[in-house]
Amino acid sequence: HPKIARWKAEPRLRRTSPISVFMAEAAEQALDSRHKKEERVGLVCALSTGSIIYSRKFFSGVLSQGRHFASPALFPETVYNSPVSHLAALFGIRGGCYTIVGDETAWVEALRIAQVWIARKTADVVLVIAGEELDALALDAYECAGWFRKGLVASEGAGAVLVRKAAEDSDGSIDISD
């Protein structure tokens, strides 16, 4: 897809895992130019497997050929926080950054953290983002955990929302716009 392919030209994302690319596009769509320049933007990320494709590649090399063949090019992407660090650098986010690793409810916890940060005036706006990449290992894990029996439809990609304090005259409802 052209919107995803353009991120491969970004030097910071040249060798990153797919989840970082998915999240970069979701962040780009959620942030407008005004928020990209704000000082107090926070970032909360929710995921369950992280960059599992690179993790599997890294550890399969270690297991099959020994620790001396562990690729230093792959290792940084095995850390759950790597997509968040890429996003913070790409978009100049200088506020708090946090990664939640969990099940399908991690997204709700990410929204709660954003709400707390805004209430405590830690951030003026918080980019809440969730993403996943698929791999046979992840699909096997979802099967073992019974997530498919609960109705999980596995997919890969990312989605993001920008959370901010409601206006004083707001009724507290959530407005979704294009």
Please state what every model-predicted region is.
Residues 7-28, 72-76, 97-112, 148-159, ...:
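Active-site pocket-shaping loop/turn-to-helix segments
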Residues 1, 111-112, 137-142:
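A short secondary-structure junction signal
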